[in-house]
C-alpha cells in the first residue's frame, strides 16, 4: 500500500535529522512503520490477502534490519526512535 505524497512528506519532516534528509535510518523506519500500520488495518478487513501479507513480512524484515543497524551505530538514537514510534513495550 503506497503512501500519499502528503503523508510521506509529513513523516519525513517529523523524523528528519536535518533539512532534506530522506535517507537516514530514522526516516526509513518511520516510513516503513507507517506503511506497516496501514497494511495491518487492511488485513483486519481482508484476512485472505496472502500476496500483500508477503509484502508486509518483507517490510517488517527491512525495518528490523534498519533498527539493528541503528542500534549498532548509535544506541541513543535507537532508543529515542523506538520510544517515538511506540514499537517496544
Curated annotation (Swiss-Prot):
Xref: PROSITE patterns: RIBOSOMAL_S15
Keywords: Ribonucleoprotein, Ribosomal protein, RNA-binding, rRNA-binding
Gene Ontology BP annotations: translation
Molecular functions per Gene Ontology: rRNA binding; structural constituent of ribosome
One protein family per Pfam: Ribosomal_S15
A Gene Ontology term for the protein's cellular component: cytosolic small ribosomal subunit
The organism's place on the tree of life at top rank: Bacteria
Ribosomal protein recorded as keyword: yes
Family: Belongs to the universal ribosomal protein uS15 family.
Record note on quaternary structure: Part of the 30S ribosomal subunit. Forms a bridge to the 50S subunit in the 70S ribosome, contacting the 23S rRNA.
Job of this protein: One of the primary rRNA binding proteins, it binds directly to 16S rRNA where it helps nucleate assembly of the platform of the 30S subunit by binding and bridging several RNA helices of the 16S rRNA. Forms an intersubunit bridge (bridge B4) with the 23S rRNA of the 50S subunit in the ribosome.
UniProt protein name: Small ribosomal subunit protein uS15
Organism (species): Acidithiobacillus ferrooxidans (strain ATCC 23270 / DSM 14882 / CIP 104768 / NCIMB 8455)
Amino acid at each position: 500500500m503506497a503512501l500519499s505524497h502528503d503523508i510521506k512528506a509529513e513523516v519525513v519532516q517529523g523524523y528528519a535529522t536535518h533539512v532534506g534528509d530522506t535517507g537516514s535510518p530514522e526516516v526509513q523506519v518511520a516510513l516503513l512503520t507507517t506503511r506497516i500500520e496501514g497494511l495491518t488495518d487492511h488485513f483486519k478487513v481482508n484476512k485472505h490477502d496472502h500476496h500483500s501479507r508477503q509484502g508486509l513480512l518483507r517490510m517488517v524484515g527491512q525495518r528490523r534490519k534498519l533498527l539493528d543497524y541503528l542500534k549498532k551505530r548509535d544506541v541513543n538514537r535507537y532508543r529515542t526512535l523506538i520510544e517515538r514510534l511506540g514499537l517496544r513495550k
